[in-house]
Amino acid sequence: WEDYKDVMHLVNKRDKKFIRDFYNLKSDRASIKIDEVEPLSEIFKRFSTAAMSMGSISQEAHETLATAMNTIGGKSNSGEGGEDPARYGTEKNSSIKQVASGRFGVTPEYLRSATELQIKVAQGAKPGEGGQLPGSKVSPLIAELRFTKPGVTLISPPPHHDIYSIEDLAQLIFDLKQINPNARVAVKLVSTAGVGTIAAGVAKAYADKIIISGADGGTGAAPIGSIRFAGNPWELGLIEAHNALKANNLRGQVTIETDGGLKTGLDVVKAAILGAEEYAFGTGALVLVGCIMLRVCHLNTCGVGVATQDEHLRKRFTGNVQKVVNYFTLIATEVREILAELGYKSLEEIVGKNELLEVIDDEFAKKFNFEELLYKLEGDNTCQVPFNEPYDQNEYEQEILKELMPTIKDPSTPIVLNKEISNLNRSFATRISGEIAALYGNAGLPDGTITLNVKGITGQSLGAFMSKGININVGGAGNDYIGKGMNGGQIVITSDKAGSDFALGGNTCLYGATGGTLYVHGQVGERFAVRNSGATTVVEGTGDHPCEYMTGGVAVILGKTGVNFGAGMTGGKAFVYDVEGNFYEKVNPELVEALRIDTDEWDTEMFELKALLKDYVAKTGSKRATHILENFRTEIRKFWMVAPRGVKPTIAADKKGE
């Protein structure tokens, strides 16, 4: 405690650097005994560690933070790199699972293992940017968790490619509430001018929690320009979001969390007074497990074993669970002392009570109008409901789930259901997949256990996060986000009324898919198979940006494609049937190359393509694929294979070693 008081003094008595430093606490209540203040265990529930992925930090650091937070009853955050399934259900499990733009490691089991699912729209330290995990940090374990190959640089896009509007965000929130109806869904925003309007939209999109992330967070791998100049203090964003939600009568529907440089109990109390109910710590927690701010997180050379995957450097890791537990215990103890001094029994009582703050008497402070930040609106200051329930309760699938539960519990006898479907029925098979994942994890059910034959135009996110053992046959058409995050099973879309040149699927299909098969007897929209890392698919045409950021899986396109093919693609392969002879011009050559495969050295690839087309014809009856198979020796000359640069000698070397 004496050591912590030294830290408190250094932080709380520092030069006026942050907005919160220009306010003192005041209260019109008499102090109370500390015994009357809520216990440490209640305060711990409001604490979490900020998102840091397995990959950005070492396995030892990641597991230490998770174990510590589970020990005290707080929450740790997995970050965006997936998590080892061996940790699920143990003290090493991260309660918060993050869904970021790269969708790395996002599987049905991953999503079901959480009590909170966090959609990371942006990071406070580098707002508006994506991310990269250098190939040097992609070890065999990291590659396995992220469904890619060791040594390959992994790129997270700047935006979520299934979120271009607040309605799109609402759809992703709905998807996540279907796969895990017991988890809160949080949306991480950065502190910026106008974040209040965004926060109101997020609440209307039925998020349960909003995170306001400040610019003072760590993110040791962020560009130096972003660290110095991008983002706003969390205080400004928190005040704006809190008041905008109150002004729109939405504050009672959502919880607000903040992060970005929180270090002491005084920081927590001031954050509560400004409107936050929960608090995340990143840099402080990392320092406790050994971080000494070398700022080489992106180089894999962290000398203390915290932010590296190098086995020799990881042996230098000295962090332990007890240090982290002690830190959060001391923070919570300081919070209790401040609450007792102010005359309040809980953090809940002071959330949003900005009358407990007064501007300091300081000449420098008088140059700014800090009083303006303390304006007050009437209404709820805290969340009043356990979940921000959507109007759509997905009764359609819940009724189907009742029919399927006996088979899910005892999959020895397969079941076939025939149903009508409409575009009102969103995220079809996602709720079913969640129940399968809860019982069997990613192993799912045996192939073909559940067959769902549906007629009509499906809603968005057909088969999102789908588990193994489910086959969906659609007689009609799909919509946007077909097979988003699917892990297994098969989706086949055909239409009696439409031919190969008709669109039977929308935009961003197979986004972040980790397995399974998608056959569409028609065209699909833009950003097809973006961040695909394991699914196999055949379609008959796409829009722009196909196979973007792809890291695994196989895509076969039997028709026209749009421009920017394979941008950011670092794994997997695509076969493209180029009848018009202009495909080569559409390839983004930065990371990939287009190769002809009509020679003997590519016989393995030709065999793979032929086998896929045979299965596709059997499932869809495609005339175009049938023509190719019947004339394979000549039609193979019209195919290009797109793969990461250098794949040709690699394949040749593999065959030589067989």
Predicted regions span which residues?
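Conserved, well-structured core domains of diverse proteins
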Residues: 1-144, 321-332, 336-450, 458-462
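Short acidic (Asp/Glu) and glycine-rich catalytic loops that position anionic groups and cofactors
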Residues: 1-2, 43-49, 149-153, 178-179, ...
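Generic recognition of stable, solvent-exposed alpha-helical segments in well-folded globular domains
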Residues: 2, 17, 42, 49, ...
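Generic secondary-structure signature for well-ordered alpha-helical cores
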Residues: 9-13, 70, 74, 104, ...
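Hydrophobic alpha-helical scaffolding
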Residues: 12, 33, 37, 51-59, ...
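A structural-propensity feature for long, helix-poor, extended segments
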Residues: 89-127, 133, 299-301, 305-334, ...
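Alpha/beta enzyme core
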Residues: 106-259, 264-293, 298-308, 336, ...
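Long, distal/terminal scaffolding or interaction modules
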Residues: 313-314, 325, 338-342, 351-354, ...
